[in-house]
UniProtKB/Swiss-Prot annotation:
Swiss-Prot/TrEMBL keywords: Eukaryotic host gene expression shutoff by virus, Host cytoplasm, Host gene expression shutoff by virus, Host mRNA suppression by virus, Host nucleus, Host-virus interaction, Inhibition of host innate immune response by virus, Inhibition of host interferon signaling pathway by virus, Inhibition of host PKR by virus, Inhibition of host pre-mRNA processing by virus, Inhibition of host RIG-I by virus, Inhibition of host RLR pathway by virus, Interferon antiviral system evasion, RNA-binding, Ubl conjugation, Viral immunoevasion
Subunit structure as annotated in this protein's UniProt entry: Homodimer. Interacts with host TRIM25 (via coiled coil); this interaction specifically inhibits TRIM25 multimerization and TRIM25-mediated RIGI CARD ubiquitination. Interacts with human EIF2AK2/PKR, CPSF4, IVNS1ABP and PABPN1.
Gene of this entry: NS
Protein known as: Non-structural protein 1
Residue span of motif Nuclear export signal: 137-146
Tagged with keyword RNA-binding: yes
Location of region: RNA-binding and homodimerization: 1-73
Domain of life: Viruses
One BP term from GO: symbiont-mediated suppression of host gene expression
Length: 202
């Protein structure tokens, strides 16, 4: 197991504990409390996947954070805040395209790491384009919100979405999932292309 994956989980556990203490003192607003609840479910899922105890991970995470804070000066903190890059949100799809319900005649679903891939195997001999909404940081895809495959007529025939229980996918996870989706659609003699925005960052 990648040690960075473990240490990231440990720090996330401790930071969740700190945020929980803030909520207990009634200092958190509604979005803060909502994120707290969602992140609790996420941490339980990650802990189960990694085989790590959350209480133990929280204690180790506290030690990591305390060590960093001991070395951190106020000036360094100011510089970090000033130089931290902001992520950009890029959209291929409209809100309607993202929220539209769709149905599969021959459904196929596959989980690839932290991503769920769904496609309709009944689709044949179509020209298909992949569109996605995602955030970008440092010139790379940071977080996939949703990817969908559309026919020229606008019908949705495939989708890649993050699993709520396994957040934290990487650029490589997204690339692999796109490869699986394209392979599945091309199997039925469909022609698949990727949007220019997605090509640039994924």
């Amino acid at each position: 197991m990648d040690p960075n994956t473990v240490s990231s989980f440990q720090v996330d556990c401790f930071l969740w504990h700190v945020r929980k203490r803030v909520a207990d003192q009634e200092l958190g607003d509604a979005p803060f409390l909502d994120r707290l609840r969602r992140d609790q479910k996420s941490l339980k899922g990650r802990g189960s996947t990694l085989g790590l105890n959350i209480e133990t991970a929280t204690r180790v995470g506290k030690q990591i954070v305390e060590r960093i804070l001991k070395e951190e000066s106020d000036e360094a903190l100011k510089m970090t805040m000033a130089s931290a890059p902001a992520s950009r949100y890029l959209t291929d799809m409209t809100i309607e395209e993202m929220s539209r319900d769709w149905f599969m005649l021959m459904p196929k679903q596959k989980v690839a790491g932290p991503l769920c891939i769904r496609m309709d195997q009944a689709i044949m001999d179509k020209s298909i384009i992949l569109k996605a909404n995602f955030s970008v940081i440092f010139g790379r895809l940071e977080t996939l919100i949703l990817l969908r495959a559309f026919t020229e007529e606008g019908a949705i025939v495939g989708e890649i979405s993050p699993l709520p229980s396994l957040p934290g996918h990487t650029n490589e996870d997204v690339k692999n999932a796109i490869g699986v989706l394209i392979g599945g659609l091309e199997w039925n003699d469909n022609t698949v292309r990727v949007s220019k925005t997605l090509q640039r960052f994924a």
